[in-house]
């Protein structure tokens, strides 16, 4: 007798988030902690809530999130992506609004690897002409 829930997977940088939404009162649980405990910065909490604001459903769902890998910024982006996918799974008519806001597209930017002979990914050693 499981209650109907919708699922979405989100990724950003090296973070992966699994997001489950079900009708409720607006509780957000991330790895068993509240959103306030998990994200200290208000900007990160705002990033997580953005798809709910666009869908005008801040207090309509209880959200359970498991997130792994990366840092806090990447995790917030992964949660936003996963929440967007879960909302689209719940109601496909939300897709155009979420797409217009830019939340549907996976941000494919990753850290570029360091190359041999260079100091960083692109920074070269100083060149001496003479």
From Swiss-Prot:
One of its GO terms (molecular function) is RNA binding. Keywords: Ribonucleoprotein, Ribosomal protein. It comes from the Bacteria. Disulfide bonds: none annotated. GO terms for cellular component: cytosolic small ribosomal subunit. GO terms for biological process: translation. InterPro entries: Ribosomal_Su5_D2-typ_SF, Ribosomal_uS9, Ribosomal_uS9_bac/plastid, Ribosomal_uS9_CS, Ribsml_uS5_D2-typ_fold_subgr. Belongs to the universal ribosomal protein uS9 family. HAMAP family: Ribosomal_uS9_B (MF_00532_B). NCBIfam families: PRK00132.1. This is Small ribosomal subunit protein uS9. It comes from Marinobacter nauticus (strain ATCC 700491 / DSM 11845 / VT8). The lineage of its organism: Bacteria, Pseudomonadati, Pseudomonadota, Gammaproteobacteria, Pseudomonadales.
């Amino acid at each position: 007798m499981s209650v109907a829930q919708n699922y979405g997977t989100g990724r950003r940088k090296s973070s992966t988030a699994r997001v489950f939404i079900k009708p409720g009162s607006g509780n957000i649980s991330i790895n068993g902690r509240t959103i306030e405990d998990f994200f200290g910065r208000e900007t990160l909490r705002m990033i997580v809530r953005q798809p709910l604001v666009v869908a005008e459903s801040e207090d309509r769902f209880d959200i359970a999130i498991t997130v792994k890998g990366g840092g806090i910024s990447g995790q917030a982006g992964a949660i936003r992506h996963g929440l967007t996918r879960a909302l689209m799974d719940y109601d496909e008519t939300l897709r155009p609004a979420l797409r217009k806001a830019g939340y549907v597209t996976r941000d494919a930017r990753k850290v570029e690897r360091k190359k041999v002979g260079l100091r960083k990914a692109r920074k070269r050693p100083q060149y001496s002409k003479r």
